[in-house]
């Protein structure tokens, strides 16, 4: 990610990287044109209720923020409403967290790109609640995966998509280029790399919202010049890796 950040900065994108995202950070995504959620995720079943137990299954995003008594008091209403849950002492968020945090539509024009596993559920149980909550909060476009995704495939798709966004392309065209390059799903990519034991269900990236969304890239040089700059930087990477 540090390399990606430097590369994108070189293409004119002001980039902020946060490796210790907190619940408070997730309430401030409206500050950015593009938010990339790179964390563990799961289509998770949990129990709730003191006297009468209930279960619920839905996509969650796992944070590295540890639960404390003080924080539990601050987030008390969110915990009671299951907008936040706890797993192994760490906070996780459900779709209702975003629906509540951005209930006034503050995410206006933001593109949300999630790398988390099972952001949209799993095969035969596709769950669009995360995407729906973010779109309801004003997000212009939301992208996320169905099923568990191979990390290298996910990083490659992100890399290619954002590079082409930085060149001035729409999110729809940028995503199409990434899929043409790395495959419609991660098993296609895996087998093309010579893999022989793919996981059970292919992960694939789905776009919701406006396919014509773009980043507000600097206008100090043209699309052609931006593409040439990207190609030069990629050539430098390949040369250094050779």
Regions found by a protein language model. Give the residues of each.
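A domain-level signal for caspase-like cysteine endopeptidase catalytic cores
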Residues: 1-82
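Polar low-complexity intrinsically disordered regions enriched in Ser/Thr and small residues
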Residues: 44, 52, 79, 92, ...
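Catalytic cores of nucleophile-dependent amide-cleaving enzymes
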Residues: 60-156
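Active-site-proximal C-terminal subdomain of hydrolase catalytic domains
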Residues: 111-229, 234
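Long, low-complexity, intrinsically disordered segments
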Residues: 233-242
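Solvent-exposed, well-ordered amphipathic alpha-helical segments
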Residues: 5-9, 108, 242
């Amino acid at each position: 990610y540090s390399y990606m950040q430097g590369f994108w900065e070189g293409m004119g994108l002001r980039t902020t990287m946060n490796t210790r995202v907190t619940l408070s950070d997730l309430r401030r995504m409206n500050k950015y044109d593009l938010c990339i959620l790179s964390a563990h995720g799961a289509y998770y079943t949990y129990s709730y209720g003191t006297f009468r137990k209930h279960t619920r299954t839905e996509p969650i995003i796992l944070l590295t923020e540890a639960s404390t008594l003080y924080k539990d008091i601050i987030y008390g209403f969110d915990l009671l409403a299951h907008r936040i849950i706890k797993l192994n002492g760490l906070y996780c968020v459900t779709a209702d967290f975003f629906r509540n945090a951005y209930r006034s539509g503050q995410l206006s024009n933001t593109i949300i790109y999630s790398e988390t596993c099972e952001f949209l559920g799993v095969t035969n149980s596709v769950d669009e609640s995360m995407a729906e909550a973010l779109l309801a909060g004003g997000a212009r476009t939301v992208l996320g995966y169905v099923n568990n995704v191979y990390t290298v495939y996910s990083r490659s798709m992100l890399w290619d998509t954002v590079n082409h966004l930085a060149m001035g392309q729409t999110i729809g065209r940028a995503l199409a280029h990434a899929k043409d390059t790395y495959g419609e799903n991660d098993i296609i990519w895996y087998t093309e790399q010579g893999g022989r034991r793919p996981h059970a269900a292919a992960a694939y990236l789905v776009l919701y919202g406006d396919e014509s969304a773009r980043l507000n890239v600097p206008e100090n040089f043209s699309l052609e010049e931006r593409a040439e700059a990207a190609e030069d930087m990629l050539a430098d990477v390949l040369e250094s890796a050779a």
